[in-house]
Amino acid sequence: MAPAPTPAAAAGRRVAVLAAALVAASLAASVGVANAAVSYDRRSLVINGRRRILLSGSIHYPRSTPEMWPGLIQKAKDGGLDVIQTYVFWNGHEPVQGQYYFSDRYDLVRFVKLVKQAGLYVHLRIGPYVCAEWNFGGFPVWLKYVPGVSFRTDNGPFKAEMQKFVEKIVSMMKSEGLFEWQGGPIIMSQVENEFGPMESVGGSGAKPYANWAAKMAVRTNTGVPWVMCKQDDAPDPVINTCNGFYCDYFSPNKNYKPSMWTEAWTGWFTSFGGGVPHRPVEDLAFAVARFIQKGGSFVNYYMYHGGTNFGRTAGGPFIATSYDYDAPIDEFGLLRQPKWGHLRDLHRAIKQAEPVLVSADPTIESIGSYEKAYVFKAKNGACAAFLSNYHMNTAVKVRFNGQQYNLPAWSISILPDCKTAVFNTATVKEPTLMPKMNPVVRFAWQSYSEDTNSLSDSAFTKDGLVEQLSMTWDKSDYLWYTTYVNIGTNDLRSGQSPQLTVYSAGHSMQVFVNGKSYGSVYGGYDNPKLTYNGRVKMWQGSNKISILSSAVGLPNVGNHFENWNVGVLGPVTLSSLNGGTKDLSHQKWTYQVGLKGETLGLHTVTGSSAVEWGGPGGYQPLTWHKAFFNAPAGNDPVALDMGSMGKGQLWVNGHHVGRYWSYKASGGCGGCSYAGTYHEDKCRSNCGDLSQRWYHVPRSWLKPGGNLLVVLEEYGGDLAGVSLATRTT
């Protein structure tokens, strides 16, 4: 039983109640309706007058196809979720300044309406910064070149563009009647994203920017609460929320705000060159139960379905095309068991206790050295309890309310009536299902080689080296750097080939001299910068040096995005010459954005028919390959096995599957116990093997016959090893 409150504590509670009332009034005013359909108090969100424990899952609409959305949403509902959470992806919706796109995978309105049809709510994270391992953190690249712009700080040009986009999204949602008070599913919005950690390094403009963002958002009058995640100083009425593997330590910045977990990480992302992360469901369920037993009322699984970084949407750099995230619904839309089923059972147990959980604060009883009981008691006599064992190795028997209960190590049992343990986080009853890839199609190939020794009419010349993104504006991963060097009679007298050294900000680079390939180098997720050092054969007279710089996704984390660079920044030197070392950095360079095949549209049916294709190109670098195939029978998800190839990009019927790369994972993959604190380097697989081998091709992109597969291979690979497979469990 809780002790009687002291007079000081009672006074403090009266102050808290008064403050909560003032915030509720402020919230009602800010949402622009007389009686807000969605509000909050210290225990939870309040929807139409009812406190709710809400279980949510992230499904990002551009990471799957519209044809997949209904099935994914239904599986989320069947798994016991109340809410679907998604970011809004600015660079997908405004790829060119002032030109908007809301079709196909970016049909946000259609996605939100499908959630409504399924009877679920929506948490709309407008941002518009998203991070999300998404290219440039969701910012459109054109924003980098707005005069005077400085990202995520108290900067006029940046704030003007950000406000314009936020207001556009809010206006669109209102016009479609999609906020809850309009009869729609949106119960909550988010502005900015994980900015709190940036404030300490963001300078004097950081805190004013965060306050401006909150006030700007509230002024849009969405009619629902706004949140800011990882923002401890979020001003009223905005709710600050938690992201992480665990959030039971978290408390909101005011005692009249609810405790909300906007990102409960179900796993982690995969990077090219990194192992594949897995999070045991026993630990994930333990983390969620810990949060709920401490008084948490909103949990969102990030991700519930991760999906695919189609096209060039992956960020990082070096984020893989798969965004599976070890989520309860896998990249292909299939249930990951036992994770999905075990969490479903957890949700059922929590929902049984919901009326008590939202009506009382827990009291804590010690029932052992590492064991505690969190007990919720309602005024009507209802009772719910969470029995916790924090020991990582030892199962125990505990007594509670006169009964004995078995608690496995690192686990929590839920008793919705304070008597019957209906669920234990470490007791998994759902069988494990192992997915299988079933090869069904091999290909007959034709090839077309890029001309590495010619320049198009679009090429242009500048003095010195130029940063890549300022030239490409991310319209292509590729930028050619070409220069000429004159070798005199005496330069080669030693008989030794000159040594070319090229320093680059990243991310991958190939070197050609007089049309001949001299290899490639690349960085990695932890350090994208790279240096090429190689002997190159040259002759007396003029020699052509061509460097193909390739981006592998733009960074997605940080604040001053305007300062980030890609490409060859130099110096570029030629040494081992009798005349000494030549610094080529400041001479004239000719630049060409993209590859010839991109300009010709070789990835499309029309473009691929406009050139003469030859026989299979084998291990030749910078070669396009195409093949036609029939769709596999049935409805099982489909994937391409690219493990025999090098690095490049894929298209099917003109749809951009994404980047592929047979980059082997470094590091160690040790044992994996569910017990003990989880982190992203724990429980990894594929060390010493490919980070990603299989690439998802959505069924809706296929027709029964005559499907066109186009592969752009940068390094060279074995075409005979490429196959199409179906995925089953």
Curated annotation (Swiss-Prot):
Per the record, the similarity remark reads: Belongs to the glycosyl hydrolase 35 family.
The EC number(s) attached to this protein equal 3.2.1.23
Subcellular compartments: Secreted, Extracellular space, Apoplast
What keywords are assigned to this protein? Answer: Apoplast, Glycosidase, Hydrolase, Secreted, Signal
Q: Which GO terms describe its biological process?
A: carbohydrate metabolic process
Q: Where is the signal peptide?
A: 1-35
Q: Does the keyword Hydrolase apply?
A: yes
Higher taxonomy? Eukaryota, Viridiplantae, Streptophyta, Embryophyta, Tracheophyta
Q: What is this protein called?
A: Beta-galactosidase 4
Q: Which GO terms describe its molecular function?
A: beta-galactosidase activity
Q: Catalytic positions?
A: E194, E263
Stored Pfam families: BetaGal_gal-bd (PF21467), GHD (PF17834), Glyco_hydro_35 (PF01301)
Q: Which chemical reaction does it catalyze?
A: Hydrolysis of terminal non-reducing beta-D-galactose residues in beta-D-galactosides
The answer to whether UniProt assigns keyword Acyltransferase to this entry is: no
Q: Name one GO cellular component term.
A: apoplast
